[in-house]
Regions:
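Active-site ligand-binding patch in enzyme domains
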Residues: 1-100, 109-112
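Flexible, gly/pro- and Lys/Arg-enriched active-site loops
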Residues: 117-154
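Structured beta->alpha junctions
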Residues: 79-82, 129, 160
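Short glycine-rich anion-binding loops that position phosphate/pyrophosphate groups of nucleotides
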Residues: 10-12, 107-109, 129-130, 175
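Glycine-rich, flexible loop/turn motifs
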Residues: 15, 19, 43-44, 135-136, ...
Length: 177
């Protein structure tokens, strides 16, 4: 399993996830990392209802200083100069903490930011054989590619059927042997 699971405030606000592994056998829970650029995370979020450590990465101070986190939560400030969290600095920090396998479970905005920064080694895509139409959400919010030489390239690593769904593993082409 992953050493850390990372998500952003869009996912916290939309889904209120716990971000813990729910397996039958006991395991060490991953470090739950919340990217909270604007310091808006509430101590009432569901992720604080379960055991395990939480790391909150922000670009500046918290807005509501009276809404204190408990002792399981550490806050770090990693500004990128444009009001967002410096994602490369966050990955470096997780590496210093010996978190070498990090799961990004996020919406299109944060997933796109990690992809655009070249911080994705592998994509695990779960694909259902259902069409949602034009109202369906995209996986990555990325700038338009003006020429194919600037596209993000991946190699198919593995395709596995899980019931009706497919699990597709893609590796970033820069890691090609």
């Amino acid at each position: 399993g992953s050493c850390a699971v990372v998500t952003g405030m869009g996912t916290v606000n939309a889904d209120n996830p716990r971000l813990n592994a729910r397996l039958t056998e006991p395991i060490v829970q991953p470090l739950r990392v919340i990217i909270d650029s604007k310091g808006q995370l509430s101590s009432k979020a569901a992720l604080f209802d379960v055991d395990g450590s939480v790391l909150v990465a922000s670009a500046g101070p918290r807005r509501d200083k009276s809404d204190a986190f408990d002792s399981r939560t550490e806050s770090i400030t990693l500004p990128d100069g444009s009001g967002r969290v410096d994602l490369a600095a966050l990955i470096d920090e997780l590496g210093r903490r010996r978190c070498n396998e990090v799961l990004i479970e996020a919406g299109a905005g944060l997933a796109g930011a990690f992809a655009a920064a070249g911080l994705i080694d592998e994509l695990l895509i779960y694909l259902a054989p259902d069409l949602l139409g034009s109202g369906g959400r995209g996986m990555f919010a990325l700038p338009e590619v003006v020429s194919l030489e600037h596209r993000l390239r991946f190699e198919v690593n593995q395709v596995k059927q899980l019931g009706r769904d497919l699990r597709v593993s893609l590796r970033a082409e820069r890691w090609k042997a």
